[in-house]
Structure formats: structure tokens, C-alpha cells
Swiss-Prot record:
The chain crosses the membrane at residues 8-28, 49-69, 76-96, 100-120, 137-157, 159-179, 217-237, 248-268, 275-295, 303-323, 349-369, 370-390. This is Uncharacterized MFS-type transporter YvmA. It comes from the Bacteria. One of its GO terms (cellular component) is plasma membrane. It is a multi-pass membrane protein. One of its GO terms (molecular function) is transmembrane transporter activity. The lineage of its organism: Bacteria, Bacillati, Bacillota, Bacilli, Bacillales. InterPro entries: MFS, MFS_dom, MFS_Efflux_Transporters, MFS_trans_sf. Disulfide bonds: none annotated. It comes from Bacillus subtilis (strain 168). The keyword Ribosomal protein does not apply. It is found in: Cell membrane. Its main location: membrane.
Length: 403
């Protein structure tokens, strides 16, 4: 994929805004859950199911689509995904049957799941070295902004135009993205497709799991996103039950985490070329582990101290995802789609498991002990996995796969 710098930048922002839209589609839905329940006359459990299936489908599609991208190319997956998202959004807007709504929501998840995956894969193809890290920071920054503004937009649009208004807007944006990507996104090179097709899907995933760097990043990303969502889900309970803060005001206390995450991605863009990915890898994991332990110590003592530790945690969560993504794309040049797909799948699995397992832990022991164990566990895991990752033999398997 040879492109001029201006063309590469145009493609970068097109796929990054497409990924931003995918995150928007997921997070804009939360504020209208009461409207969905009332409009379709269904139980809270059924409404929550519509949230869960979206995440489950998104996670599963990462593995499926990653392999398809490697063997068939990204453009066909991108265009098909946006078409599916547009059609499903229209279906969600017009249907009056909740079962059909659920099916359309699943199709929407399958379509939009392709967009962040293709963005990360395309960045790996268009950029190398420090430029790749900077581009990955841009990608992650837009992904970080979406969860911060999507609930606000969802509440505003849902209040003014109902849930239908949200899905009509998502459909309209999908059509704009379809046109834009059709014009700007490059056609897949036949020679690249033939080169990639020499392997098979099992060989691609085997190379990921037998690669030391891949194993370390996948393991740490699962644990980190497990902890991140355990904290996210626990916060409203802590704020309302321990500090007796109104739910509306409690939402504002997510801002330190959201804003510092955005700041962390910006920081990654600025420093990744200066200090090196391996040094940044060690430092960001140390900061993440320390901030989790500090949260365990401070969360029930002081709102101010808790906000500061959340801000520190947010900075590490802004740095680590683009860092891990960059290292994955650097490590797996010939099966990049499969590797990024597996990385995203592991992240989503951690997100889903964190709230469930942490809820059980909180019934067994005090919250301070629960989060201390999680923080110490992440620190110990990082310490144990770093030496194998930096072993000089870590690239052997990947080289064999490249042939």
C-alpha cells in the first residue's frame, strides 16, 4: 500500500472517524434504556439483554473479521460492515417488535465491529516506526472521546426525538461514512491478498499464541480491562451508597477518568517517539498497577483523593491501548488483522468478565481488599511477564510464519 503522505493522512482520519462512530453507536444507547423499556413494554432484563448481546457480538466478530481481513482484504469488510450498520440502524428505528429490534441491534454490532479493527489494521499498513505510534494515538484518542460525549448526545437526542431519532441519526452518519470510505479507502492489492492466503486461519492464530510478545500483551490487556470495568461498574455504587451523592451528580465524577484518558492518548502521541515503546510499556504498566492500588486505599476515604487516583489511572488507560496496539501491529506484519482482532476480542472479554467477577469478590471481602488484590495481581503479573517478553528469542515463531 504505497500512498503519499497527504493521502495517508486522509485515509487515517477517515478510518479513525469510522472507528469513532462505532464507539458512538455502542455508547449512545445507554441513556435511552428507559425509553426502550417503555416503548417496547419489556422487562429490565430484556433491555439489559440488548446491551449484552451488542458487546458479545462485537467481541466474537473481532476474531471472525480479523481473519477475513487478512485473507480477503479490508475494503470489502469495511464497505459491507458500514452497509450492515446503516440497514440495521434503519431497522431499529422503524420496528415495533422487540425481537426484531434485538436482531437488528445484533446486526448493527456485527457491522460496526469491523470499523475499529480496520482502523488499527490500516494504520499498521500505512505507517511505520514512530509515525505508526503517533497515528495509533490519534485513533485511540477518538475512541476515548466517544464514550465521554456519546451519553450526553444520547440523552439529548433521545429526549427530543425518542429512540427512533438516535437510530435515524446513526443511519444517516453510516451513509455519509459509506460514501466517504468508498472514495478514500484504497482497494486491496491482489498481490498482498495472494501472499496472505498462503497461510490458513489456524496458522495465523497459532502464530499469535506462540509469540511471546503477543502472549504478554493479550494476557495483560485482559487483566487490565477486567480491572478497568470493575472500577467503572463499582463507582456509581460507591458514590451513591457510601458518599450519598445523587445519581445525576455522580455521573460528573466520571469526568476525571474520561478526561485523563483522553490526555493519556495525547501524551502517548507526544512521547512514544522519544522514549521507546519498551520503556513506555514498563512505565505505563507500573503507573496502572500503582493507581489501582491507590484507588483501593483512597476510594472510601476522600472524594478528592479518589478523583486524583482515577485521573492517574485514566492517564495509564490512555497510554496503554494505543501502546499495545502499536506493539501488536509491529509484531505481526503479515497477519495483522488476525492479531488486532484477537487483541480486541481479549479486551472485550475482560470488559465483560470484570463486572461479574468483581461483584462476587465484593460480596466475599471489603472493597479495599478486593481492589488491592486486583492491583497487586496486575503488578505481579506484569513483573513476571516482562522478562519473557524481552527475550531475544521472542520473534522466532513469527518469523517462521512470515516464510
Amino acid at each position: 500500500m504505497a500512498h503519499t503522505k497527504s493521502k495517508a493522512v486522509l485515509i487515517l482520519y477517515t478510518v479513525c472517524f469510522s472507528a469513532f462512530f462505532a464507539s458512538l453507536s455502542q455508547n449512545i444507547y445507554s441513556p435511552i434504556l428507559p425509553i426502550i423499556k417503555e416503548s417496547f413494554h419489556v422487562s429490565t432484563a430484556m433491555v439489559n439483554l440488548s446491551v449484552s448481546v451488542f458487546m458479545i457480538v462485537t467481541a466474537i466478530m473481532q476474531i471472525i473479521l480479523g481473519a477475513i481481513i487478512d485473507f480477503k482484504g479490508a475494503r470489502i469488510v469495511l464497505i459491507t460492515g458500514i452497509l450492515a450498520t446503516a440497514a440495521a440502524s434503519i431497522g431499529c428505528a422503524v420496528t415495533t417488535d422487540f425481537t426484531l429490534f434485538l436482531i437488528f441491534r445484533m446486526i448493527q454490532a456485527a457491522g460496526s465491529a469491523a470499523l475499529p479493527l480496520i482502523a488499527a489494521t490500516t494504520i499498521g499498513q500505512l505507517f511505520t516506526g514512530n509515525e505508526r505510534g503517533s497515528a495509533m494515538g490519534t485513533y485511540q484518542m477518538l475512541l476515548s472521546v466517544a464514550p465521554a460525549i456519546a451519553p450526553v448526545l444520547g440523552g439529548f437526542i433521545g429526549g427530543a426525538a425518542g429512540y427512533e431519532g438516535i437510530f435515524w441519526i446513526l443511519a444517516a452518519i453510516s451513509i455519509v461514512l459509506l460514501v466517504t470510505n468508498s472514495i478514500t479507502f484504497p482497494k486491496d492489492s491482489p498481490t498482498e491478498s495472494m501472499q496472505q492466503a498462503k497461510g490458513n486461519v489456524f496458522a495465523h492464530y497459532k502464530s499469535i499464541f506462540t509469540n511471546r510478545t503477543g502472549n504478554v500483551i493479550l494476557t495483560l490487556s485482559f487483566v487490565l480491562f477486567f480491572i478497568y470495568f470493575a472500577v467503572i461498574v463499582y463507582l456509581p455504587i460507591l458514590l451513591t451508597e457510601h458518599y450519598h451523592i445523587d445519581v445525576g451528580i455522580a455521573g460528573l465524577l466520571y469526568l476525571p477518568l474520561a478526561l485523563s484518558t483522553i490526555a493519556g492518548t495525547f501524551l502517548f502521541k507526544r512521547i512514544q517517539a522519544k522514549i521507546g515503546l519498551h520503556t513506555l510499556f514498563i512505565g505505563s504498566n507500573v503507573i496502572a498497577a500503582c493507581s489501582i492500588i491507590l484507588f483501593a486505599v483512597t476510594h472510601s476515604v476522600s472524594l478528592v483523593l479518589m478523583a486524583l487516583t482515577l485521573a492517574l489511572f485514566g492517564i495509564s488507560m490512555g497510554v496503554i491501548p494505543p501502546l499495545y496496539s502499536t506493539m501488536i501491529t509491529n509484531e505481526f506484519e503479515h497477519n495483522r488483522g488476525s492479531a488486532i482482532g484477537m487483541f480486541n476480542f481479549i479486551r472485550y472479554t475482560g470488559m465483560a468478565a470484570g463486572p461479574m467477577v468483581s461483584a462476587y469478590l465484593l460480596t466475599m471481602m471489603p472493597s479495599a481488599m478486593s481492589f488491592s488484590l486486583l492491583g497487586l495481581g496486575f503488578a505481579a503479573l506484569s513483573f513476571c511477564l516482562l522478562p519473557p517478553m524481552f527475550s531475544p528469542q521472542k520473534r522466532t515463531k513469527q518469523k517462521k510464519h512470515h516464510m
